[in-house]
């Protein structure tokens, strides 16, 4: 597929009419695969390419989407991908890397950080790490340096204070917590940077699969906290990446 510059050069040389050029440019924005209409123009519009949501898609469908995207951009990120599904598609994508804790797949080399600033990913407990790793892998794939600060929840708050220099040095802080979700408010009261809070479904009984943590974060008294959906490490990292690269 010709690039935009190549198409414009053909028009300038009289080898292609403006109408034909416009048609080629429009056609190059998507890839119709029958089961998916892949957005090839998203990176130009939004700054980051389309990310594949692996849940609910077959291995064959994911391979097709990756192959379409790879014509335009690398690296390519797939989220919510089980180990079993990765094993099924790996023969077709031998260079793919599986991040087991995050349940993410990347194709293509991770880019160097685009800015000197970094994103801190902070968790309350070890059980929150799958969501944290989804956030960290997403942020790294989008060209950000990530500092991981794990297992520093309020049950042993001295652990948090020992890492405050790292957290305060970040341009954006992602705080991930289940149970009652108090860590986001604590961090929000200690830093002068944007805090993106991610409630997780870690907990039982009246944690209500993360609803309690979500409501705690939404009702935080600490200013400067933004809250995303339960277990949405990807969404937090996407927003944090936009802030870090402004």
Swiss-Prot record:
It is an enzyme of class 2 (transferase). GO terms for molecular function: hydrolase activity; transferase activity. Pfam families: AIRC. GO terms for cellular component: plasma membrane. Disruption phenotype: Deletion of this gene leads to a loss of lactate racemase activity. Signal peptide: none annotated. It catalyses: deamido-NAD(+) + hydrogencarbonate = pyridinium-3,5-dicarboxylate mononucleotide + AMP + 2 H(+). Its EC number is 2.5.1.143. Keywords: Cell membrane, Magnesium, Membrane, Transferase, Transmembrane, Transmembrane helix. GO terms for biological process: 'de novo' IMP biosynthetic process. The chain crosses the membrane at residues 172-192, 206-228. Its cofactor is Mg(2+). Its main location: membrane. It is found in: Cell membrane. Gene3D superfamilies: 3.40.50.1970. Induction: Induced by L-lactate and repressed by D-lactate. Is thus regulated by the L-lactate/D-lactate ratio. Makes part of the lar operon (larABCDE). It is a multi-pass membrane protein. InterPro entries: P2CMN_synthase_LarB, PurE_dom. Involved in the biosynthesis of a nickel-pincer cofactor ((SCS)Ni(II) pincer complex). Carboxylates the pyridinium ring of nicotinic acid adenine dinucleotide (NaAD) and cleaves the phosphoanhydride bond to release AMP and generate pyridinium-3,5-biscarboxylic acid mononucleotide (P2CMN). LarB can hydrolyze NaAD directly or it first forms an adduct with NaAD that releases AMP and reacts with bicarbonate/CO2 to generate P2CMN. Is required for the activation of the lactate racemase LarA. May also be involved in the activation of other nickel-pincer cofactor-dependent enzymes. PANTHER family: PHOSPHORIBOSYLAMINOIMIDAZOLE CARBOXYLASE-RELATED, SLL1489 PROTEIN. NCBIfam families: LarB. This is Pyridinium-3,5-biscarboxylic acid mononucleotide synthase.
């Amino acid at each position: 597929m010709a690039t935009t510059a190549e198409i414009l050069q053909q028009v300038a040389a009289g080898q292609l009419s403006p109408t034909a050029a416009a048609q080629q440019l429009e056609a190059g924005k998507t890839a119709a695969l029958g089961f998916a209409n892949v957005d090839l123009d998203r990176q130009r519009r939004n700054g980051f390419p389309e990310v594949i949501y692996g849940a609910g898609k077959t291995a064959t469908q994911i391979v097709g989407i990756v192959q379409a995207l790879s014509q335009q951009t690398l690296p390519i990120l797939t989220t919510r991908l089980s180990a079993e599904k990765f094993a099924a598609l790996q023969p077709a994508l031998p260079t793919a890397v599986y991040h087991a804790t995050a349940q993410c797949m990347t194709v293509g080399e991770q880019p160097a950080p685009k800015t000197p600033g970094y994103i801190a990913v902070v968790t309350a407990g070890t059980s929150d790490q799958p969501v944290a790793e989804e956030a960290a892998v997403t942020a790294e794939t989008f060209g950000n340096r990530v500092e991981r600060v794990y297992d520093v929840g309020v049950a042993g708050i001295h652990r948090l204070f020992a890492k405050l220099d790292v957290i305060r040095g970040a341009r954006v802080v992602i705080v991930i917590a289940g149970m009652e979700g108090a860590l986001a408010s604590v961090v929000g009261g200690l830093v002068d940077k944007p805090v993106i809070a991610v409630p997780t479904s870690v907990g039982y009984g009246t944690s209500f699969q993360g609803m309690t943590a979500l409501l705690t974060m939404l009702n935080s008294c600490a200013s400067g906290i933004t809250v995303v959906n339960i277990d949405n490490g990807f969404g937090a990292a996407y927003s944090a990446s936009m802030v870090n690269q402004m």
